[in-house]
Amino acid sequence: MNKYKRIFLVVMDSVGIGEAPDAEQFGDLGSDTIGHIAEHMNGLQMPNMVKLGLGNIREMKGISKVEKPLGYYTKMQEKSTGKDTMTGHWEIMGLYIDTPFQVFPEGFPKELLDELEEKTGRKIIGNKPASGTEILDELGQEQMETGSLIVYTSADSVLQIAAHEEVVPLDELYKICKIARELTLDEKYMVGRVIARPFVGEPGNFTRTPNRHDYALKPFGRTVMNELKDSDYDVIAIGKISDIYDGEGVTESLRTKSNMDGMDKLVDTLNMDFTGLSFLNLVDFDALFGHRRDPQGYGEALQEYDARLPEVFAKLKEDDLLLITADHGNDPIHPGTDHTREYVPLLAYSPSMKEGGQELPLRQTFADIGATVAENFGVKMPEYGTSFLNELKK
């Protein structure tokens, strides 16, 4: 008999809670995503996360300990060697990743692009981090006139190739992206995703078409999600979860436009009758505020998210479990634009916890979440991770 019929897992993308013990190896000494945002805001107002026990993990400005937290609380340390979204999420579901995905804030190495030019017969322009619309405004006309390929990246581990559909036919663009995917399986160039970004229109009025195609990497092994799906449990992926796992172990995928849309979709799944896992990623914290080093925007987004939690609490049933965590840090006060190697918070709450919660031991790997989910549903346990299911008292 499952202890919980439904588990709702929420990943607040990049919401770290202080430097990890190995932060120095990543150039991240002193990083502290929530702590620094709380200082910047002169106190973060997150009363619902505080009720669950956020301040009991660690007190920060505006975030204090409570006598009787509603939930169980601790922090988790990442075991894998990367600090990117895919590594963090894959570890949460029971995998250990010893090859970090690469990010290219200065653009891609010349050797890689030379090889891509040679194999495709087309010149490459761009080669820098940029937003998709800005790069088209800047280079779209040149691409049309020369037949070159616009190659660009973002703060994430991606290589994107844009070309006008009337200049480079879709079939050819897709072939080019497959070549790029092969080249980037090499450890030193390993990107999580290669993306075909076709566009149409005239200079000054370019638009990206729906013919985008992603060439992702599948997880390097079976995850707890695969085990759940194969045992006929529901795995509802909300936001970019399905992309992160390349659809592996997903039974239903709900796309989101924003954090608030993500919270709406979470409420929708709370209203659904299912048995299994609802898995939500809230990406705005990372994409809109962390990489852009915007502590004010980040703080406001955290407060907006917190204000939606009472709606979630009200719909949770006695046999539901809510787990809230993060996948890495992205301290908006830290130098640079990259993620930061930090501990992440873990909060666990069910309305059946009548006595309230208490501190859980520090988790040595994010995979403890996957192990807990697996044990709850009686599916094969992951190779990594220790379940804390029996420590959650009703």
Swiss-Prot record:
It is an enzyme of class 5 (isomerase). One of its GO terms (biological process) is metabolic compound salvage. It is found in: Cytoplasm. One of its GO terms (cellular component) is cytosol. Its cofactor is Mn(2+). Pathway: Carbohydrate degradation; 2-deoxy-D-ribose 1-phosphate degradation; D-glyceraldehyde 3-phosphate and acetaldehyde from 2-deoxy-alpha-D-ribose 1-phosphate: step 1/2. Its EC number is 5.4.2.7. GO terms for molecular function: magnesium ion binding; manganese ion binding; phosphopentomutase activity. It catalyses: 2-deoxy-alpha-D-ribose 1-phosphate = 2-deoxy-D-ribose 5-phosphate; alpha-D-ribose 1-phosphate = D-ribose 5-phosphate. The keyword Cytoplasm applies. Binds 2 manganese ions. Mn(2+) 1 binds at residues 13, 327-328. Keywords: Cytoplasm, Isomerase, Manganese, Metal-binding. Mn(2+) 2 binds at residues 286, 291, 339. Isomerase that catalyzes the conversion of deoxy-ribose 1-phosphate (dRib-1-P) and ribose 1-phosphate (Rib-1-P) to deoxy-ribose 5-phosphate (dRib-5-P) and ribose 5-phosphate (Rib-5-P), respectively. Belongs to the phosphopentomutase family. This is Phosphopentomutase. The gene is deoB.
